């Protein structure tokens, strides 16, 4: 059986491994960088397989976080009351198990209980991540804009899902 639980600091080394195995769909991170993201995040959730092992995670931030990501800054300038998903990553072994759906349903519920009016995120267009774009479309994410980041080496689709 699969489940979700709050991430803890002791999980972060495993989170780095899962994250970096997802490259180039997600940027590589060090333990220090993931710890900083963890500390900035108001939503920190792990997805577990039937053995209780972390096979995926999500980190998301409230408005007003002291975060200098080009994408977060873009949304901060356009949305007053959003929950920004910095990353959602799964190990290959977790794909197709419904964990992404479970995690996003939980995240959207969290955003609603926080009184947020939208969930925001970005998905890579270059390098392409078509699976993630399809996944986000299923949750009602709509195009806001595109943006070149990291000196033009990455192009992202900026997305938002309005919350009713």
Question: Can you describe what each PLM-predicted range is?
Answer:
Residues 2-15:
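A short beta-loop-alpha structural element at the N-terminal edge
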Residues 24-51, 59, 65:
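Active-site rim helix/loop that mediates acceptor-substrate recognition in acyltransferases
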Residues 59-87, 151:
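Conserved acyl-donor/pantetheine-binding loop and adjacent beta-alpha core of acyl/acetyltransferases
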Residues 77, 146-164:
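C-terminal "cap" of GNAT-fold acetyltransferases
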Residues 86-95, 125:
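A short, internal acetyl-CoA/4′-phosphopantetheine-binding micro-motif in the GNAT/acyltransferase core
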Residues 90, 96-109, 138:
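Conserved acetyl-CoA-binding loop-helix of GNAT-fold acetyltransferases
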Residues 101, 125-145:
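Conserved active-site alpha-helix within GNAT-family acetyltransferase domains
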Residues 111-125:
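Conserved GNAT acetyl-CoA-binding A-motif
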């Amino acid at each position: 059986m699969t489940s979700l639980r709050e991430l803890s600091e002791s999980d972060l080394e495993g989170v780095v491994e899962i994250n970096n195995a997802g490259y180039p769909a997600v940027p590589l991170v060090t333990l220090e960088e993931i710890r900083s993201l963890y500390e900035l995040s108001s939503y920190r959730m792990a997805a577990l397989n039937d053995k209780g092992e972390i096979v995926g995670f999500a980190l998301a931030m409230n408005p007003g976080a002291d975060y200098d990501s080009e994408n977060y800054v873009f949304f901060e300038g356009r949305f007053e009351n959003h929950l920004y998903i910095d990353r959602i990553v799964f190990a290959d072994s977790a794909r197709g198990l419904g964990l992404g759906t479970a995690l996003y349903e939980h995240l959207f519920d969290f955003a609603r209980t926080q009184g947020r009016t939208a969930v925001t995120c970005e998905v890579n267009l270059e390098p392409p991540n078509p699976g993630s774009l399809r996944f986000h479309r299923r949750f009602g994410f709509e195009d806001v804009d595109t943006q070149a980041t990291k000196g033009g080496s990455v192009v992202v689709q900026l997305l938002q899902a309005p919350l009713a």
